[in-house]
Swiss-Prot record:
Binds 1 zinc ion per subunit. Zn(2+) binds at residues 182, 185, 306. GO terms for molecular function: metallocarboxypeptidase activity; zinc ion binding. Transmembrane segments: none annotated. GO terms for cellular component: extracellular space. InterPro entries: M14A-like_propep (IPR036990), M14A_act_pep (IPR003146), Peptidase_M14 (IPR000834). This is Zinc carboxypeptidase A 1. It comes from the Eukaryota. The keyword Secreted applies. GO terms for biological process: proteolysis. Its main location: secreted.
Amino acid sequence: MSLTKSLLLALLAVVALAGVSAERARYDNYRLYKANAENAEQLAVLKQLESSSDSILFLDGVHIVGADVKMVVAPHKVPDLLEILGKAEIKYLLQSSDVQKTMDEIDEKVAMKGRAGEAYNWAQYYELDDTYAWLQTLAIENPGVVTLIEGGKTYQGRSILGVKITKSGKEKPGIFLEAGIHAREWIAPAAATYIINQLLTSEVEAVKQLAENYTWYVLPHANPDGYVYTHTTDRMWRKTRTPYQGCFGADPNRNWAFHWNEVGASSNPCSDTYAGPSAFSEIETLSLSNYLASLKGKIQLYISLHAYSQYLLYPYGHTGDLPDNVADFRKVYDVSIAAVNKRYGTTYTGGNIYDAIYPAAGASVDWAYGTQDVRMAFCYELRPSSNSFITGFKLPAAQIVPASEELLDSIVAMAAEVNNLGYFN
């Protein structure tokens, strides 16, 4: 059976699976607090809260002193939380007294299911099966240019579907773009599909060169099960959907076999940063890593899309030690964040993962750089900034296009500088 036919059958299975009803999680009267640990003792208190309570959803990892940590807190848990914070003298700020109301005020605008094949666009977000149908259509309409690829499988049997784009008609240096590994970060897959479309249709000379000079591998959804769950059940879901000891899922961006679970991850299955019981315990990361390994030597630039906070990051996440080619990373970083700023004045910051944002071992970019001879690997944390929206994972649909445009501007500059430095030779 051809890949196209087998994937069509898989898509039918996905549609059937997505139809199973589930009660949607709501956050009525949940509070959103921002706390900041000023010393190691206070940090330990927050870490204990993160590991022991299923009534507090941590939107940020609890890893370093001085970093803001946002917490969504169930109404019945608020008195206990405030007592604990008070005793530890941890400073906090109430940012929302009704998280559900705050979320409802943001117009994400999800497309009506089944309409993607007619007019897929970037004025709205799409469910998984509609995006997969669109990718299938691209492969049919662009023979010899777009090839449907299966980057892996999921616990629930879905395909990690993407496209390979060879606009020149022959193999060129490779760029791999992975998005959506964290399920709730909807802007990441949307931006990935925008880039696919621009590579195929743009008349802008710099974008045409980007399409023609490189072989592209783009996977908009590296965590399909989790993404489906954000549409059917819990908009704030982050992890995979593998069952573990009364809780579900591991953090797929803490599960890669490169300094796995050394720092910046949790061993608690109920934590949003649960690293899994072992490296590559998740079918998603294991199968995707196998696919990437099959491309070893063909990929020179790896890009991972996340949200939010407007960062551009490079290895490492497990240590403050810097890559041996850090001088080149900094050159690429400088031109890339300058480019992202030009169109709309959007400000990105960043640097090496460990120091710029927080320790995070077991990430995909570190694995690609550390084990696959991919000498340039970057992670974008897209819009909004950390202070722009209370629920930063819910970016209004009206911002999909501008966020994606400035990202593409940045990637154009990034690829040019990586080429200037000789990495595509």
